[in-house]
Amino acid sequence: MSAKAKSRLTPQQRKATLRRVLEKIRPYSFFVVCSLIVAAVSVAAQLYIPILCGSAIDLMLGKGTVDFAGVMRVVVQIVVVAVIAAFAQWLLSVCNNRITFSVSRDLRNAALRKIQTLPLSYLDSHPSGDIVSRMVADVDTFADGLLMGFTQMFSGLLTIFGTLLFMLKENVPITLVVVCITPLSLVVASFLAKRSYKYFQGQSSVRGEQTALVNEMIEGQKVVQAFGHEAESLDAFDEVNGRLQDVSLKAIFFSSMTNPATRFVNNIVYAGVGLVGAVYAVAGGITIGQLSIFLNYANQYTKPFNEISGVVTELQNALACAARVFELLDAEDQVPEAENAKVLETDGHVELKEVSFRYLPDRPLIEGLDLDVKPGQRIAIVGPTGCGKTTLINLLMRFYDVNGGSIEVAGEDIRNVTRASLRGSYGMVLQETWLRAGTVRENIAYGKPDATDEEILAAAKAAHADSFIRRLPNGYDTVIAEDGGNISQGQKQLLCIARVMLCLPPMLILDEATSSIDTRTEVRIQAAFARMMQGRTSFIVAHRLSTIREADVILVMKDGHIVEQGDHDELLAQGGFYAKLYNSQFEGVET
């Protein structure tokens, strides 16, 4: 969905978003009730203070002397009521914070759990920065709006109705002056809120786009600098940044008009009460103290309209962000596991029967693929870029489901076994290394958290990683920066290999496993892999054909089909597509 489309949610969609927000609040109904009760106490105390002040004023006016004793009694009452109001306001803040940040926590937890169930196709087609923006920035903005809503909306509405009752009790005509003029604030606020909402929605969307772009630029900064594309990167950022500025200015323009417009109406109300009240006071209809009460109430009555108009604007922004979070939560999950899904007990036998797959409906990638892999065989998959090698690995791991045919492991269709048991049967070394922020020891033990130090050390030695690990500042307790930023690419690859060495699952998938390791290290790693692969079904994906010469079977893929199959010597003797790939690689090395 484009940013423009996102910014045009219909009123029905906004109502649906609000309903879902209320559903998220429902588990915290106890705190909502407490908040309402405490807000009522706080408002009642605040509204009682003007009455006490009016009484004190009347006690100081008149033909006789000032009633100092009476004034002191009133002052003591004012202090007590003010303390009660302050304490109630503090409790209100505690309750509202509990509601807001609990809902925010629940939303983030739900979003992260959702990401765990999303199909790989969703993650491949959505920028990671945008997903992060929804989980972090959008939830934060939503929390700010929700907190303001709870803090000011409850007390504001209670203040409006409370002051209205007190004013009606004191003088109906003056009250009518207030009631007739004040609703103009709501008309103005409603008009501006409708126009600011779509811009806040657009702002949230463009902010997510900007986060994705910044994330991409930071991760690829070395490549950008190597190719001298700094200017192009700045231009791309300036374009997104400019759009964010434009939509933000429009959103702020309409939202910032709300406060002065409502204050203008409030000042008219205050002046009207002062004039009409003065006439009544001169005529003897009310006392000076009562006029003071009305002026205070007029201010307190109109102030919530001003605050609520600001709250409405913030809630519009909060709803816009909530809609983006709910859009993530509503994304279609990966195909659920079968109700009677089995735990896979594999013997290493893998069979593909008439497998077909496509990323796009009109563009088939793999068609009619048949393959029978015996237990313990080493299967090398080679071919030009885009022929389907990595896709085949994704299908074996069930990151994607086949569109036709079936994949069986140990005679079981992988759609009938649990994903956890299927993926736990494979050890993977991917082309793109991934390390978590933690120690070297924790990264090696990622697949086996209960591993002993002896097992971790043995795995590192088997992967030829022990020597470089010991040279690190704190050895195995060295903390690795985000995505391994403080070690080399080759060292990251060695740690990923050690991670697999520790688990030793029955099947292996090696996707360009040694593409970032120097030749000397590669020889050592190949020897370690040879020992590790003994008796284990292994799938090897590589562009460097020299790394798969020892494979039992080489599958040569082209346009989603296996065009040749055999061992290295057989395929070279055929002089076919594999021979051309092999010879062209070494011709390139020689030149």
Positions of PLM-derived features:
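Membrane-integrated ABC transporters
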Residues: M1-Q46, L61-V75, L92-N96, T100, ...
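ABC-type nucleotide-binding domain
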Residues: E337, V343-T591
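Hydrophobic alpha-helical membrane-associated segments
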Residues: V41-A45, I49, V79, V83-T100, ...
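A hydrophobic transmembrane-helix motif
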Residues: Y48-P50, G54, V81-I84, G149-A193, ...
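Cytosolic ends of transmembrane helices, especially the final helix of ABC transmembrane type-1 domains
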Residues: H229, F253, Y270, Q300-L328
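An intracellular "coupling" helix at the cytosolic face of ABC transporter transmembrane type-1 domains
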Residues: P27, L120-S121, A137-L146, F150, ...
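Transmembrane helix-loop-helix hairpins at lipid-water interfaces of multipass membrane proteins
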Residues: V32-A88, L168-P173, G284-I288
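Short intracellular "coupling" helices and adjacent cytoplasmic loop segments at the cytosolic face
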Residues: S2-P11, F101, N109-S133, A137-V139, ...
